[in-house]
């Protein structure tokens, strides 16, 4: 008898590659519709000419054991004669990776064979199908349940007949839809964006008596290692086997050399149990707790107290860390964002290396998790490789500061006597663990407040006394004051939680700031990033100021990558401090359990003849992430050994495999083959530019005193103390003398504000506020009464606004960027007191008494006067004659993060 099977191809979105197994990409196949008894003879061929398909077509003879199955690769139109010694169900795989085509396979079967009972969800009554299956001599049947297809083996026939197929359909579809949502995948029949899901996908489920372990997720199906389906037919929120194996379809690259195998997918499983279960069931039945939450929390607390490396924790201890990470309101945004970021990386050609996992999570979080990670011994990397294949700084703390992220921390470390059952302070929000992460805003309901003193230790108190400081929970300022005359900060009426302290950083002296507990009260997690933990009961804190003289941007660094180019470590060569510091972010550089030497650094002191070594194997199970610091006196030799090419980058050049010898000189490390004399100036200058670009992308940092601006200032002085190229990014103390704020104020009858144009040239910022005047600026005039026009260096209109005297004005607020040699034309029908210029809050009485006012920006100032003033010495652009009626144009209006100055 003849059978023809026509199957579509599986279209891959741009982030998936042929041969990858994620999200069931190779699970789709179509049944021939028969069960072949053992030793049945048949012929099979594919029709390549008809459809123009170019990839091999695969026919599979499936049953309930991989050892008795067979795969047939069809590569041409020729018939293939087959005889298989085991009972089997033939299927045709959907070819993967081709668009707009089909595959057609012809079967000619000799001898008896059995029709395969097939059920397609919701296309016919379930009982009709079950009756057919019950009466059939076939032990097999095949189910199409939308997002899952199930080949039921003979050993599961009776169970299947007693199973509610609607519940089974809902169970599988709810899991896969939820996992897709956690990844931010979008249904898209064209599959042409980085967020596109796989069209027409479905997981394939079968039994496999020859499979590994208890069950597995594979390239072509997921299966229990049994001749029956077992748990795969049990509908229950506690069915960990099924939700676990389906979760493996979403591992992507997050388990590659991260020691998160069986953890990443479990975090998906835990999330769906979190969704399915009520509060009581969550504590009693969820796999993460199993009615033993206090004991499990105590075990994790012991791991933290004993500084056990996180990489050595067991599966479910690691899983808990992810559960608490995702529990907060916006916690799952972190998961969606990191999956979107993965797809962006994967869609590039060639694919750029993926960031270190903990830094990656930090960069994708809605909140700040650094202190939480640090508490459990996780160290996010400082650097990553961007889309231009360039190593750049994450600036995680600066990013968090710019975005106003709240700092989440376990509640048990904030309210130290908190217990979910015994003393929960009647907190109304849902918490499931004493380790749940909270922010100060969520603890306000406890009514716990106290006065906390921050003791400032500084060599010159005059640098900070009387200077303002403030305390923030995200973007909310919860307290502000000035440093007292005794040099301390007094926080009055502050509630528990982790805040970001915006402390003064000095005046003409710059400092590194280190925040820690008071010596006799060791409860505060010390850090250099101004994360201030206010606990209950309350303790005083110590803020130590250390002179900051040589910029961190003037310190050369090496970047170590693993065999798969995942980030492993940063090596800082600090010539001033005469140290070499290895910041280890990944204890695995290659294959698991492999003890082959991968990297070695040896520092030799030429004066006393001693040496220090730092060694990394492919897998380093006894090591922990963090900092390893070694002395390196001036003229020390430093031998760097790397096993492979293109895996160790020094400054911006990859070192060859083998040994490289460096020397620690007074200002830099030196190797004649790499660094010409004075190269530290060039590399420092390049790092300044990179960090300035970062601030440009996070403009809020221009208004907040921070260490990055200190670093740019000190590095600029090191490179060229006479240059003001980076003045815009200097600390306020050095920038303020060059900061001019110009406010043009249009005034109407009764001195009402009609329109204000404010410009701060050094910050490249402009703001326009329009008042609300229903009768217009001056109802006696039916011609243009006022206008504002800003043009760029090529004459293009950046902003334009005008009103007739009797034309209504409604409230508007615009913010946009302006740069050197931009020009401004203002028109006022009644010159004089109707248009004022206020410079740095002082009225400028020299403004020309003219209807038309012109201005041109320099790097730091605004030159105001007649029309000729807009012609720059180094710019021959002459604008067209002024148009009094400018119209309402708003072209290239740039919205910055926030402009506190306005």
Swiss-Prot record:
Q: Enumerate the InterPro entries for this protein.
A: Mucin-bd (IPR004954), Peptidase_M60_dom (IPR031161)
**Domain Peptidase M60, chain residue ranges per copy:** 27-330
Which key words are in the record?
Answer: Glycoprotein, Late protein
Cysteine disulfide links: none
Glycosylated at which positions? 73, 265, 278, 339, 540, 593-594, 620, 782, 840
Instruction: Give one Pfam hit by family name.
Output: Peptidase_M60
Instruction: Name the job this protein performs.
Output: Involved in disruption of the peritrophic membrane and fusion of nucleocapsids with midgut cells.
Report the protein name in the record.
Viral-enhancing factor
């Amino acid at each position: 008898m003849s059978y023809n099977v026509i199957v579509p191809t599986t279209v891959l979105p741009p982030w998936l590659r042929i041969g990858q197994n994620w999200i069931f990409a190779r699970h789709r196949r179509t049944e021939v519709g028969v069960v072949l008894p053992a030793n049945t003879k048949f012929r099979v061929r594919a029709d390549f000419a008809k459809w123009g398909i170019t990839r091999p077509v695969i026919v599979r003879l499936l049953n309930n054991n991989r050892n008795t199955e067979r795969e047939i690769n069809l590569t041409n139109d020729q018939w293939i004669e087959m005889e298989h010694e085991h009972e089997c169900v033939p299927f045709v795989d959907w070819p993967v990776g081709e668009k707009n085509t089909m595959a057609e396979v012809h079967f000619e079967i000799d001898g008896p064979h059995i029709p395969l009972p097939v059920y397609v969800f919701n296309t016919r009554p379930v009982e009709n199908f079950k009756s057919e299956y019950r009466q059939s001599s076939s032990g097999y049947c095949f189910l199409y349940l939308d997002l899952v297809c199930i080949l039921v083996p003979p050993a599961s026939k009776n169970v299947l007949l007693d199973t509610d197929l609607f519940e089974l359909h809902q169970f599988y579809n709810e899991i896969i839809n939820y996992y897709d949502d956690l990844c931010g995948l979008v249904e898209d029949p064209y599959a042409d964006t980085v967020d596109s899901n796989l069209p027409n996908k479905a997981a394939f489920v079968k039994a496999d008596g020859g499979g590994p372990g208890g069950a597995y997720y594979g390239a072509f199906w997921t299966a229990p290692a049994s001749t029956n389906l077992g748990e795969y037919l049990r509908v229950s929120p506690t069915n960990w086997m099924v939700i676990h194996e389906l979760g493996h379809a979403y591992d992507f690259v997050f388990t590659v050399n991260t020691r998160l195998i069986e953890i990443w997918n479990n975090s998906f499983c835990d999330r769906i149990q979190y969704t399915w279960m009520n509060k009581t069931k969550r504590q009693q039945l969820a796999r993460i707790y199993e009615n033993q939450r206090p004991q499990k929390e105590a075990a994790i607390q012991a791991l933290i107290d004993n500084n056990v490396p996180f990489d050595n924790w067991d599966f479910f201890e690691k899983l808990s860390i992810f559960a608490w990470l995702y529990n907060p309101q916006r916690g799952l945004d972190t998961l969606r964002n990191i999956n979107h970021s993965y797809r962006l990386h994967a869609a590039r050609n060639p694919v750029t290396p993926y960031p270190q996992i903990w830094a990656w999570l930090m960069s994708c979080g809605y909140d700040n998790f650094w202190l939480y990670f640090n508490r459990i011994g996780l160290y996010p990397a400082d650097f990553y490789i961007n889309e231009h294949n360039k190593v750049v700084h994450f600036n995680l703390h600066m990013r968090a500061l710019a975005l106003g992220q709240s700092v989440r921390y376990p509640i048990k470390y904030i309210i130290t006597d908190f217990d979910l059952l015994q003393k929960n302070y009647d907190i109304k929000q849902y918490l499931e663990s004493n380790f749940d992460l909270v922010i100060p805003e969520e603890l306000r309901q406890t009514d716990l407040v106290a006065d906390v003193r921050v003791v400032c230790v500084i060599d010159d108190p005059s640098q900070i006394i009387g200077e303002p400081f403030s305390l923030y929970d995200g973007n909310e300022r919860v307290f502000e004051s000035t440093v007292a005359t005794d040099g301390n900060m007094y926080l009055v009426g502050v509630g528990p939680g982790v805040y970001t302290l915006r402390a003064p950083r000095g005046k003409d002296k710059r400092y590194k700031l280190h925040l820690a507990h008071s010596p006799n009260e060791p409860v505060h997690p010390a850090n250099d990033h101004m994360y201030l933990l206010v606990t209950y009961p309350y303790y005083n804190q110590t803020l130590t100021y250390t002179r900051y003289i040589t910029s961190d941007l003037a310190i050369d660094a090496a970047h170590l990558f693993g065999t798969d180019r995942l980030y492993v470590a940063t090596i800082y060569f600090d010539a001033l401090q005469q140290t070499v510091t290895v910041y280890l972010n990944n204890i695995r550089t290659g294959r698991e359990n492999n003890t082959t030497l991968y990297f070695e650094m040896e520092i030799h002191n030429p004066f006393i003849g001693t040496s220090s070594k730092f060694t990394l194997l492919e897998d380093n199970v006894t090591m922990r992430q963090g900092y390893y610091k070694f002395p390196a006196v001036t003229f020390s030799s430093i031998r760097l050994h790397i096993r492979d090419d293109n895996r160790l980058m020094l400054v911006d050049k990859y070192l060859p495999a083998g040994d490289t010898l460096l020397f620690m000189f007074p200002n830099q490390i030196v190797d004649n083959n790499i660094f010409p004399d004075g190269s530290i100036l060039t590399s420092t200058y390049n790092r300044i530019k990179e960090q300035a670009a970062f601030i440009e992308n996070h403009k809020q940092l221009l208004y907040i005193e921070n260490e990055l601006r200190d670093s740019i200032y000190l590095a600029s002085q090191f490179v060229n103390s006479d240059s003001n190229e980076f003045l815009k990014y200097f600390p306020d103390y050095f920038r303020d003398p060059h900061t001019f704020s110009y406010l043009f104020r249009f005034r109407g009858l009764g001195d009402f504000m009609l329109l204000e144009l404010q410009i701060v040239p050094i910050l490249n910022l402009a703001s326009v506020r329009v008042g609300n005047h229903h009768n217009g600026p001056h109802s006696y005039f039916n011609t243009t009464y006022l206008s504002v026009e800003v043009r760029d260096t090529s004459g293009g209109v950046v902003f334009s606004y005008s009103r007739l005297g009797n034309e209504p004005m409604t409230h508007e607020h615009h913010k946009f960027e302006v740069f050197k040699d931009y020009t401004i034309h203002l028109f006022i029908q009644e010159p004089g007191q109707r248009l004022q210029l206020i410079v740095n809050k002082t009225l400028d009485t020299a403004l020309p008494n003219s209807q038309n006012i012109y201005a041109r920006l320099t790097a730091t100032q605004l030159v105001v006067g007649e029309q000729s003033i807009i012609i720059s010495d180094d710019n021959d652009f002459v604008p067209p004659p002024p148009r009094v009626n400018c119209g309402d144009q708003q072209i290239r209006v740039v919205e910055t993060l926030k402009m506190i100055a306005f």
